Amino acid sequence: MAKIILKKGREESLKRFHPWVFSGAIAQIVGEPAEGDVVEVYGQDGKFLAAGHYQIGSIAVRVLSFESGVINDDYWKSMLSRALAVRIATGLADSETTNCYRLVHGEGDNLPGLVIDWYDGVCVMQAHSAGMFRAKKQIAQALVEIYGDKLKAVYDKSSGTAPFKAGLDLVDGYLYKKDGFNDNEQVVVENGHKFIVNWTEGQKTGFFLDQRENRALVEKYAKGRNVLNLFCYTGGFSIYALGAGATHVDSVDSSAKAMALVDKNVEIGSFDKSRHTSLCVDALDYLRDVPEDKYDLMIVDPPAFAKHRGALNNALRAYQRLNAAAISKVAPGGFVFTFSCSQVVTKEAFALAVFSAAAQTGRKVRILDRLNQPSDHAVNIYHPEGEYLKGLLLYVE
């Protein structure tokens, strides 16, 4: 096994259990590790610090363990069992009203580079590192062992997330299928609401599970209101609003595929179609042209405006423009649920962008709640970068 020797003084982050080793911290590589190999990390004093997946790039090692010798044949089953135990402890894995959740959330479950979502018997995984991609068969086998007969399939959807320069064969496909299972989509239930999830053609793993608790919060406020759901994707917030008794819901997204799924979700929910309109248009263009006071509840949940620090300033300006448009148009006494899923945008920076937006409109705005990601998207306390989803619930006079 290859060894990574750190520069003097660069071991402190590992001693604080941060799960990344940056390339600039490395003094020497002993051996010739391939991308995705498990390597051991040592300080200048020769003491073992961690073991993890090696990769060429800014993050050179993603730590799998701070103990020596534990990455063995039982490792994957042990780690996935621990992740499942947390979902059982929080009541999510055996919920009577929800049968979809995130099983593995990367660093939050001490498995950096790996995401696994559970959709009522189907596990959809995405590898964000060469090491996790190369371990996908072992991961699938471990899922079979921990779920048993409950598991219908394991689908690998890493072609858009794994590093394409690492020489990997990035083709999506099934790693396991139970006899007789031939579906690429199915209906799942979240807090009693039905949704169609297509893991082969949908974005990410097929559904944005990280907004589950925030969708439930929208449900509390939507009764009797005219609702606008911007960047709606498959209409998660829209379905909750309809279920709450919203007077009317308009769902807006630029993706025709997404809008088709919104309509299907409205249909399987048995909602009165006259209470919902799907609009396949640019969200910001629509918001600029919409009459003032038409909506008294808005959801503003755009895709990540910044995926790296170089795009941060442009992203903050985009959040300011978007939120200024929403705050200026919402009816007096209305609510705005606004979000950022950009990891590089901090809670403080996002709040400042929204403050600037509110000041630009001149309206009186209260923050009623600060919104986050749910328990199955846990944040490793030693890896604060994992807290990527942030939101504000605004009341606008």
Residue ranges and their predicted role:
Residues H248-D253:
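Conserved SAM-binding motif I beta-strand of class I
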Residues D296-A325:
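Mobile active-site "lid"/loop adjacent to the S-adenosyl-L-methionine
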Residues M1-D120:
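Non-catalytic accessory regions of SAM-dependent methyltransferases
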Residues K257-I299:
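S-adenosyl-L-methionine
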Residues G224-Y233:
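Conserved class I S-adenosyl-L-methionine
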Residues V104-L111, V115-D117, F133-F207:
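Non-catalytic substrate-recognition/targeting regions of SAM-dependent transferases
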Residues T234-A246:
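Conserved SAM-binding loop of SAM-dependent methyltransferases across substrates and taxa
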Residues K294, F335-E397:
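C-terminal catalytic and target-recognition region of SAM-dependent MTase-like enzymes
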